[in-house]
Amino acid sequence: MRIALVTGYVTAGSATHADPRGQAVRVATLASTLANLGHQVTVYARKDSPARPAAEEAGGVRFEYVPAGPAAALSQDRLLGQLGTFSNELAQRWAQSPPDVVHAHFWTSGLAALGATRGTGVPVVQTFQTLGTPRKSVMSVDQAVVRSRMERLVGKTVHTVLADSSAELDMLTGLGVPRTAITVVPPGVDTNAFDPAGPAARRGKRRRLLAAAPASAEHGLETVIQALAALPAAELMIAGGPPRAEIRTDPVLQDLARLADRAGVSDRVMFTGKVSRARIPVLLRSADLFVHVAGDEATGILPIEAMACGTAVVAAAGGADQDAVVDGATGVLVQPGDAQALARRIRQLLASPMLLEGLGIAAADRARSRYSWDRIGKETVAAYERAA
């Protein structure tokens, strides 16, 4: 099958060097997986740097960098103004040798893909990766309105939408996307990199809780810090965010630091700053528990990566976490915003090493069996075949 992946940003090295939470890692890894399954894969991304070549190949995948506007990173508003050019360039490249299916990542790429395939009969499959609905609090009113309208348009026009979770499926149907046009295909995890066997970061005598730095306004870390006050034998490591030198000037992290000070736990809360992709599993293996209680997220890759490392997860009973974490088997689910309940569940887990070990073993097994890239790649191809 000739597969075209369309995205705003990706490079041939994204699978190993990009922001671990960015869409570039996911697109590059999916492309490599599809190529390993025997498909002809080309990734199309807007050229965002003068140093970027016209095309390059890596791991059996061809990456083409399409000129559309200035060869620089663009804000959402400026990018929208270049989508017509991006779409026209794609249409010209596909005129003589169209792909069997186009898979767009993020809503802006969906608009470009729909324009490029208009009247050709080539099906477009859409992965949003993130929807604007749970992020409205961090967008301007105008941005939220535009994004909501465009996501609805893309979702209702493409042949198939691949939702990351049951939570995203519900959001999509709320936008008016027909249920029959949606297939749940979660993000995959690299089970070679994220594995229980491997080095772990050094730690002291305290029990370690690991959480991710905020990716949105509704991150739930206030609840975790409040719960820490009732867990005197534990420490909280918040991994990721801006470079270490910028932690003291980051407004979100400083709000959390002030909350930790008021709660009397500032000596037990650590901010790592930006973490390389290779360092993430090292930190995950060092933790007794990975805590992720942002209940609105439609994509649950962070708990999945923790599970793959054999680390049990305490997650929110809402959002994508409910798909990933099997309550009582690979971790526990708690109601978002309840610090007392969170502290109680964490205390119970930390008091039972055998239970914690059993949860970790089951978590790693579930990550390997359900979320390996090989399985996710095959599920994605099945969706392509239904669309084509």
Q: Which residues does each PLM region occupy?
A:
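Carbohydrate-associated surface elements
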Residues: A167, G188
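Conserved acidic donor-binding segment of nucleotide-sugar-dependent glycosyltransferases
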Residues: D327-G328, V332-A339, Q348-P353
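Conserved donor-binding/catalytic core segment of Leloir-type glycosyltransferases
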Residues: A201-H219, I225-L231, M237
